[in-house]
Amino acid sequence: MTIKIGDRLPDVKFRVMTGEGPQVKTTDEIFKGKKVALFAVPGAFTNTCHKMHMPSITTNASAIKAKGVDTIAVTSVNDIFVMKAWQRDTDPELQTLFLADGMADFAKAIGLDIDLAAPGFGVRSKRYSMLVEDGVVKQLNVEDNPGVVEKSGGDTLLAQL
């Protein structure tokens, strides 16, 4: 089943990097009582994700937060160390929370996983943006093609706030 507007996020664990090292955070800990702009990419450091999607998020981060968003988060099916390196490279001001979905548990649980085995990536997340309020999906913008950022960028979600 694919998640849709009005659905509650499932209970899944992410890995996040903190000052004390890698930590486990549940969807409840991340989303409960908060307004969260969640962006998902197929892979850290991949061309579209790195050169198009992340810049659309970081460029619009201040404006998104000014619209009442508590947290801007980015998730990908990568391990926490890759996500930390990607954050260091794309978001040195730490405007976003990077959520490692290493085994695609979240992507699969919400039905937004994609099999990219043919190009050598394996199971990944579809590219999307989502506005979540207190764990409930309020906006959802899923790309039809994982190689483009036409409706999942920071500018699109900003316009929906």
Question: What is the role of each PLM region?
Answer:
Residues 1-161:
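Chalcogenol-based redox active-site neighborhoods
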